[in-house]
Amino acid sequence: MYITCLDVEGVLVPEIWIAFAEASGIPELKKTTRDEPDYDKLMNWRLGVLKEHGLGLKEIQDVIAKIDPLPGAKEFLDELRSFSQVILISDTFTQFAAPLMEKLGRPTLFCNTLEVADNGEITGFKMRVEQSKLTTVKALQSIGFDTIASGDSYNDLGMIQASKAGFLFRSTDKIKADYPDIPAYEEYDELLAAIRNAMK
């Protein structure tokens, strides 16, 4: 029994923090896990920048409401779900992801939660588990699934390498060069074909 595990940002939807950085005029918020592999460090730094600028959850949600999935992402996901169980595994937060999941046809999403004060200030974050992507893939394997995984970033490498088949999708030149053994694709139809092939 196969189950496909996909990263979300950079694979199906634009990077939320990059979109927010552009809309808010705070270019330093463009830093993502592609640049900083330590997610805790990255998030604590982001929260500090938000606090410094007096920006809270509402401001970020207003931007997210205007973000659409990447062109072709919904069709790709619909096609993939027609022949595979699919779980989206992301380091994003439920409070950010809801409007985007609506636009993708409400797929199953495993992610994290923000801690938000009554005034809307994001005060912290609660990770579901340590190394959530790798931990989730291993848990699925422990209950009899063969996993196929794809993502674009450093924090996807664990689940990609631990899966029966794993692929980079629209990743950086550096990650592709550092991990030449992982097949890398740029187009949804290529990724679909690779996933189908892995299930044979």
Please report, for each region that a protein language model flagged, where it lies by residue.
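Short amphipathic alpha-helix with an adjacent loop that forms part of the alpha/beta core around
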Residues: 194-200
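Short, well-ordered alpha-helical microsegments
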Residues: 94-98, 156-157, 192
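Substrate-recognition "cap/lid" segment bordering the active-site pocket of phosphatases
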Residues: 95-147, 178
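Acidic, Mg2+-coordinating phosphoryl-transfer loop and its flanking beta/alpha structural elements
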Residues: 86-91, 145-186
